[in-house]
Amino acid sequence: MYRRSYVFQTRKEQYEHADEASRAAEPERPADEGWAGATSLAALQGLGERVAAHVQRARALEQRHAGLRRQLDAFQRLGELAGPEDALARQVESNRQRVRDLEAERARLERQGTEAQRALDEFRSKYENECECQLLLKEMLERLNKEADEALLHNLRLQLEAQFLQDDISAAKDRHKKNLLEVQTYISILQQIIHTTPPASIVTSGMREEKLLTEREVAALRSQLEEGREVLSHLQAQRVELQAQTTTLEQAIKSAHECYDDEIQLYNEQIETLRKEIEETERVLEKSSYDCRQLAVAQQTLKNELDRYHRIIEIEGNRLTSAFIETPIPLFTQSHGVSLSTGSGGKDLTRALQDITAAKPRQKALPKNVPRRKEIITKDKTNGALEDAPLKGLEDTKLVQVVLKEESESKFESESKEVSPLTQEGAPEDVPDGGQISKGFGKLYRKVKEKVRSPKEPETPTELYTKERHVLVTGDANYVDPRFYVSSITAKGGVAVSVAEDSVLYDGQVEPSPESPKPPLENGQVGLQEKEDGQPIDQQPIDKEIEPDGAELEGPEEKREGEERDEESRRPCAMVTPGAEEPSIPEPPKPAADQDGAEVLGTRSRSLPEKGPPKALAYKTVEVVESIEKISTESIQTYEETAVIVETMIGKTKSDKKKSGEKSS
């Protein structure tokens, strides 16, 4: 989130001429000429007072002329010294060189990223080929496993069949043995019958028939027994063949398993190696992409800084040109007792410039993931005003405050929140130290101011009454005051322009009570609070009286030291300017009485010169303060630079000022 606060202060100091005081002090002459002898002494005294007043006025003019002559000599000597533009130019040149180096580094990283992408593609293609080969091997292994399972099932089936056949063979053997025993028993019985029976022709013929039948049966039984033996031998041969086939299949399956196990282990090792290489390549690619993103962010930040430096140089160049060329003489309000220390002033200026140019770079580190807001608003008041002994100075102050708030939030991806900070090889990257540069410019400014500043003189307490008007502006727009010109500022946030005008108080006027102005709305919205008759609020100058704040009486050195302490403590600095409050705190609307008593800006600008004495000398002090806040997360690094505070004083007569106001309107 970037915040820029521009505080423009304008002061007017008016001085009455001594002739008015003398005319006011001059007594009226009596009308009667007969009293000439009595009033001659009074006339002589009045003439003596007038002569003394003219002599005193001549002395004051002579002192003022001497002070202006010393200021002119001081500015001529300052013109010979080297200004802060050289330091800024060198800083800009170094930043440009840094940008060129970063661009070369980015190109190198892009080439490395391209090579890494090409290597990743090659590894991916190899990995895909290996995956395809692995799939083919897996399919082949599955097919072989299926064939082995089928062979095992077929072997089991053959074993079962062989077992059944073995059972059948054993049953047939038992049956044939029983049949053989029965046949032998029959033969033995027949032989006994033949031996025991008497020979007879009938018995012999019958026995022969039975013997023939029995021999036939024995032959049939022997043929059956031979067939059973042949079947048994055939089954035994099949059994031996099946056992041999089973053994061969078991050996083939075992060798295939061993071979495929070795190949699968080898392929698994290759796949694991390729996976590790791919993971390493992905990590390298992720790191390269992270480096590229970091370089892109750093390049964008450096471009923004270069643009800001260009704008600062252009603005300060224009302001210094207008201050030193157009109206360089009445730049300081004090003209009494100007003392210049040339002995140590040059050394101090040289040392301040060396501090600016030799600002050491600081290490760029990632802060915590907590955005911090820091707003630095610095006010610098002039140390003293010109006080003449017989003259009574009436001060008329005009305060213009412009607060420009620019807020931008960056959203990143969720994965960038967990990314560790970038660690590069070699020494860490250095960035310009804007704080030291700003402190150096502040020191240079104080040295120059102390060199040409006149010593403080006791001031008589002056009564300060301010009147203020708020005008809210949004977008690319600006507010133009007839007496003060504000350049157009590209406003991405809300712009609040506060104009406070002082009126010259004469004797008998009553001091009004101070009131607080209405703060501008948030988020850059235009607060158009209209009256009952429909007139917008930005055309109604609201008169408010503001008491001088005690903080404004501090010197510029104390304020610079306070600002440095605030920058070191990194705490947001509260706004202490009179007539302005925190823009984030809403306030109840203004009463209708103040709105009814307001007048149009043109009428006010025309009526203001009539209040002060004619031919009054006016001084104008413009102070620009810019503070840029740092945004940081764990994945993005930015730079923090504080702005350069430059104060210029432009002196014009009231007639020239009125002409410039009419041109701006």
Curated annotation (Swiss-Prot):
Region described as Head: 1-40
Coil 1B: annotated span: 85-184
GO cellular component, one term: cell cortex
Principal location class: membrane
GO molecular-function terms, A-Z: structural constituent of cytoskeleton; structural constituent of eye lens
Tissue: Expressed in the cortex and nucleus of the retina lens (at protein level).
Site positions for Cleavage (by CASP2, CASP3, and CASP7): 433-434
Presence of the UniProt keyword Membrane in the record: yes
Region spans: Coil 1A: 41-75
Compositional bias (Basic and acidic residues): 556-571
Subcellular location: Cell membrane; Cytoplasm; Cytoplasm, Cytoskeleton; Cytoplasm, Cell cortex
Record's function text: Required for the correct formation of lens intermediate filaments as part of a complex composed of BFSP1, BFSP2 and CRYAA. Involved in altering the calcium regulation of MIP water permeability.
Family, as annotated: Belongs to the intermediate filament family.
Protein name: Filensin
Organism: Homo sapiens
Recorded name of the encoding gene: BFSP1
